[in-house]
Amino acid sequence: MAHKKAGGSTRNGRDSESKRLGVKMYGSQVVKAGNIIVRQRGTQFHAGYGVGMGKDHTLFAKIEGVIKFEKKGEFNRRYVSIVAA
């Protein structure tokens, strides 16, 4: 016979690994082609001139230059562009 009563199990103790999302390079920083600028879920930031978007909505530099963040359009969307240096 057991000398201790069986303890119940907890339903806690899990957590997902962080995805390291966010802005990786900021305005007026110099970037090379291929540098990641923003990692995001969905389009919080839209791709402007000289910026490409990956299938997971990651924004990356297509040309070398200086990053420019701006709001424009009817819905005040945030765009990331690259100005050639």
UniProtKB/Swiss-Prot annotation:
Keyword Ribonucleoprotein belongs to the record: yes
Any GO BP: translation
Domain of life: Bacteria
Family annotation (InterPro entries): Ribosomal_bL27, Ribosomal_bL27_CS
GO cellular component, as recorded: cytosolic large ribosomal subunit
Chain spans, region Disordered: 1-21
Sections of the chain in a coiled coil: none
GO MF annotation: an example: structural constituent of ribosome
Assigned keywords, A-Z: Ribonucleoprotein, Ribosomal protein
Family: Belongs to the bacterial ribosomal protein bL27 family.
Name this protein carries in UniProt: Large ribosomal subunit protein bL27
Annotated source species: Pseudomonas putida (strain W619)
